[in-house]
Amino acid sequence: MTPVTAYTVVFLASASTLVLEIVAGRILAPFIGVSLYTWTSIIGVVLSGISAGNYLGGVLADRGGSRRVLGLILVGGGLTSFAILPLATPGLTTLVPATYPGVLRIVLLTALLFLAPSLLLGMVSPLVVKLTLADLGRTGRVVGRIYAWSTLGSIVGTFLTGFLLISAFGTRRIVFGVGLLLVGLGVAAGARPLRRQGRLSSRKPEIAEGLLLLLVLLQIHLRDGLQSGCYRETDYYCVKVHAERLSDGRLIRALELDHLIHGYNSLEDPTYLHYGYLRTAAALVDRLGTRTPRLHALFLGGGAYTFPRYLEAVYPDAVIEVSEIDPAVTRTNFEMMGLDRHTRIVTYNADARQVIERMLTGRTYDLVFGDAFNDLQVPYHLTTAEFAREIRNL
């Protein structure tokens, strides 16, 4: 194997591994949420797969690893990447008993999706080293360069996915693209080298088999495997909106971010409050409103904008500001959740702490309503004593 081929293979294989690792959080979010436990499980499972793959790849290399073996491993990595898509459905959570401890369930569900491709792609570098080494006197330089290109691929895959690919294509198309890339790379890497006399004929069987495999996979996955089930997939959430009819005939809509419903709204009646805690808050604000000529309220987290809409309807003179980190959530509220496009509510699409520290210095509020959630918990940086002091100074 030539150095250029070796560097290309390890670069793309490692980039694919990190692409899958980054999208894992978004793939799993609708089923188990995104928390410290989720990301700990993802990182641990992927690293375990890479470690086991490095070991097994070394064993295969010593037993006579060939280009065909390398090609099969890459194709296997592509196929197990494709397998993520049909598995990542609401039925995924039924594969691990609900009686298992929560953290163990998260680890096992993560492993079901991402351990196999991580393991197979971890086998690539040791095999490439074996296929590239021709002179033991250059072992250090060859191994060093191969692992440098491998690490560079991981870096590029990380930044490219987090900053560009998810926003541009969505997670399922990314996983599908990784699968196609790996299958194509496996076919190319496993094919016999061109002969000077035979030209392309020596590769025709492998190329034909690879193209047929790609066509079959395209047919299977383009039918329904690329459908995420999200109304909108953002950099932060899988956003879903669904309608429900109450026993009194009232039609309401629910805004679901990942696997947590953030609010129910009536499109016709902005004063409708579905949750008891919001009705309690409304009663407290009513007492506050009688003592305040013009209510000035700040909401940390917009969600379904349920309570901001309520205040806008009940207190026409109120000044209402919302810090909502995800602009796509705000757009969804305009489109689907009844937020008036001519609303007086002022929205800052930024992190709540940054909004307070950088944009609201010197302002005062009658009410600060904390409604920011990341999965089932309040983001840590919004729970610190320092942040509480900043709130008190508003």
Regions found by a protein language model. Give the residues of each.
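Alpha-helical transmembrane segments of multi-pass membrane proteins
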Residues: 1-232, 243-251, 259-264, 275, ...
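A short loop-to-beta-strand scaffold at the N-terminal edge of the catalytic core in hydrolase folds
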Residues: 235-241
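Periplasmic c-type cytochrome electron-transfer domains
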Residues: 255
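Short beta-strand "acidic-cap" motif of Rossmann-like dinucleotide-binding folds
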Residues: 322
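Short alpha-helix immediately C-terminal to the canonical SAM-binding loop
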Residues: 330-331
